[in-house]
Amino acid sequence: MVESIETVIIGAGQAGLATSYALKQHGREHIILDKASAPGNSWRSERWDSFTFVSPNWTFLLPGGEYDGSDPDGFMTRDELVRRFERYAEKYHLPIAFNTQVISVQQVEGSGYLVKTLDKEYHTRNVVAATGWFQLGKKPSFADKIPSSILQFHTSKYRNPQSLPPGAVLVVGSGQSGAQIAEELYQSGRKVFLATGVAPHAPRRYRGKDIFRWLYDSGFIDQTFEQLSFQGREFVAPMISGKDGGHALNLHKFCREGAILLGHTLDVVDGKLVLAPDLKENLGKADMGQKNIVKNFDAYIQRAGLDAPLEDLPVWKDGYQAPEITSLDLQAEGINTVIWACGYTYDPSIFKFSFLDKNGIPDAPLGISSTYPGLFFAGIPFLPSLGSGFFLHVAKNTSLIVERVIGSGHLEH
């Protein structure tokens, strides 16, 4: 059975819901397809129990569902965030087909796209890919060399310390998720080994404001791929947390409090983890990242003539005294769990045509495909700006898409 409909939105996360809201405000025919049973599934099922929103509540800017609570500078829990998605979808009666997995999107010569699900097919003029940028959890190729007696999984499967087998834990990756999970584990009494990367340290608050206020006010997240420096293009979310009122995460502090810091992982040979001797280098990059962040904030404050009291941030050096460990016998160290915090990758496999540019980003300035009429991307960083992946810009991003949909006319049934 083939149903004709003007627009199909794939994904019922924040970008998909915001696009649906805007289309409904204009009376445009559409449907959201989502494989889960409720909206915001990645937040619901791929975040740990104590997860809190990393950006302050005031940044929750779903159009028509902006944060209106009593704590704009606080941080929502996972469950509160999910409840807001549910209430939003119910309040606006958004047309969502849950438990509906899209298996392919094909071009139909001269007349749009054919979207196939396990049960049904849709002929549509417009497809809005709103599945987000962070889809498939990454693991290194040598993950299968980890001894079978050791439990291993991606951060998306982590829930709490109590759910893990007894013993030490190796966390591979020190970005936001890896650092937050490592902190929770060692604070719960676990022995934690943390293989570091190059995510920058950053102050949670600086010169009287939260880091997100400075990122927003300074225009940093408004920059396009072309406008950003190489470091900006390789933007790695800084080590901060929204837990316990919000705080900075710092590898030197982790070291002081008992975590064992390592360089980045290279391989597993005969049950031993092979590590690069680059812990000090990684720490240096993390520290330099913070210096660059605050340097940019200071320059903006001066440029804008703002009255913001000067602040000297604490200087931590503990990690530089840690030994460079290049081989780690997992079983001898009592490590019974490995958590891969290596980030995510985008999965374009449902699309039966190619649309990625040389940088691996959809060729879609403003979220609007340059090559395929009626193909749109919502909620992806750099489409059009870095902030497109944040709640802060979800309304701005989707409004551009909806304007183009409206301008394309209605689908002839």
Label each region the model flagged.
Residues 46-73, 211-228:
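N-terminal glycine-rich dinucleotide-binding loop that anchors FAD/FMN and/or NAD(P) in oxidoreductases
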Residues 2-37, 41-42, 76-413:
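Flavin (primarily FAD) cofactor-binding/catalytic cores of flavoenzymes
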